[in-house]
Amino acid sequence: MKKILSAFVIIIACSFGLHAQQPEGKFFKSFDGTKIYYEVKGEGYPVILVHGFTGTSQGWKHGSLYPALLTAGYKVVILDQRGNGLSDKPHTDAGYANDAEAKDIMGLVSSLSFKNYDVVGYSRGSIITSRLIVLDKRIHKAVMGGMGADYTNPQWPRRIHAYKALMGDTTMHDVDDMMVWIRKNNFDNLALAYQQKHQPSTSKKELAAVKIPVLLIDGTEDTTNGDVTDLQKLIPGSKMVSVPGNHNTAGNTVQFASAIIDFLK
């Protein structure tokens, strides 16, 4: 348990890294007035990439998937989820509750006039992707990377421990590494705490009703978020692919990109 939890900090910060960000895109005003930073590149069928905890849109540019999608002719949309990067960082419960992050993406899709789209999430981005495939009928195909079934538990211990630590509880030693990383990089602790407090869970009943094609993809050495085979059992017809690497490295691999390109065809 401690080993798994201590890896929390690196869930996305390393695999879809923490990178200095210069604005090259635009801002979208979401349903509650929160400004969401995004970039669009390419001319083909739209694919939205959803980063994970402490990540930003720019992390995707340092892996294999982003350039592979552009080369394959897709229109690629990357965004900073609220509380991250160049997007606004609300310090209220309302700023993150009730699927706010999924609503941001759905609103962005509407503003871009996409009739349909595919979505790829990694780690916490897969948790948001899970909400999208339940809430948004415009999704054609979805990919969830680096995620097992643990997030379906509303009382997921790791989420609760992370929230408490971010709020100042110094007894949550299983997330000490996470807190060191956050302090080192001067992240907005309160915004991150609200993200953990209101991190959505998707019920097994909701997942059982999913009708679209879903690809589950993880690293051969990744045990960070539970067993992906357990999640596959919950989503009818979902496919599962394993690629080399652990939670921090699998999402950057050529094999990760190739599996997704093949699935989206």
Predicted feature locations:
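Conserved loop-alpha-helix segment in the C-terminal half of the alpha/beta-hydrolase fold
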Residues: 220-245
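Flexible "cap/lid" loop of the alpha/beta hydrolase fold
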Residues: 127-134, 138, 142-169
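Conserved acidic catalytic loop of the alpha/beta-hydrolase fold
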Residues: 99-117
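Catalytic active-site module of serine/aspartate enzymes centered on a nucleophile-bearing elbow/loop
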Residues: 243-265
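The serine-hydrolase catalytic nucleophile loop
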Residues: 54-66
